[in-house]
Amino acid sequence: MKRRELFTGAGQAPAGTCCKPGVSRMATLIPNALFRTQDNKPVRFYDDVIKGRQVMVMMMYANCETFCPLATQRMVELHHQALAPRMGKDLFMVNVSLKPEQDDPAVLKSYAQMHHALLPGWSFLTGDRYDVDTLRYRFFSHDHIGIDQDPDQHAGLMKIINDPIGRWFHADAFASTRTVLEHIQWSDPPKALAERLKDNRKLQERIDRDRVLYGYRKIA
């Protein structure tokens, strides 16, 4: 079955959206539904999971035999390759079950253990069907109802949310390591000018080096 094509980009608030003074824009966009973690701990999705944090959100279900285990394995690899120093500190990962009727906290914990995903800053959530569908519709809805109702079409798709600066990005867990890391970097808080100029110089050096080696910029 073909997975739906993913377009990447920054999330924007709907026209006319406004917030009360002192209230995050994300608080008006993200459901604050009650979920339970793999440790059976009750959490509110916005207040306890998203608020004040930079969070990668991905959908899955435990008995999935297609994209879910591959996406989980991919994120475990990224954790060990590059994300471990940040996870649980200024970067978090959360997987939300698409089949909450089957995936209670114990099932999610078993899934996480099987895939070596019980890692710092990484949570697995389950909740009521209505709340899961509301969350999925907010983050990963598709105009075609048949595609939208197929759980496999949502597995592996990721939303990177940065609450403090009010931005979110679409990403795909199956993209290259560099691409996923670039999406995470794009959602990071803005850097100071001197640091941005330094990063730009490094990027230009890499582009120049790739041109010499390959005759074009290599995409890894």
Question: What is each stretch, according to the model?
Answer:
Residues M56-M58, M93-S97, L157-I160:
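Soluble periplasmic/extracytoplasmic beta-strand elements of cell-envelope proteins
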Residues T28-L29, R53-Q54, Q153-A155:
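Short, small/polar residue-rich loop motifs at catalytic or cofactor-binding pockets
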Residues L118-T179, Q185, L193:
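Thiol/selenol-based redox catalytic cores and closely related redox-interacting motifs
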Residues F7-G11, G16-F45, F174-A220:
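Non-globular targeting/processing and membrane-anchoring segments
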Residues D47-V49, M60-N63, S97-P100, T126-D128, ...:
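A mature extracytoplasmic/lumenal domain signature
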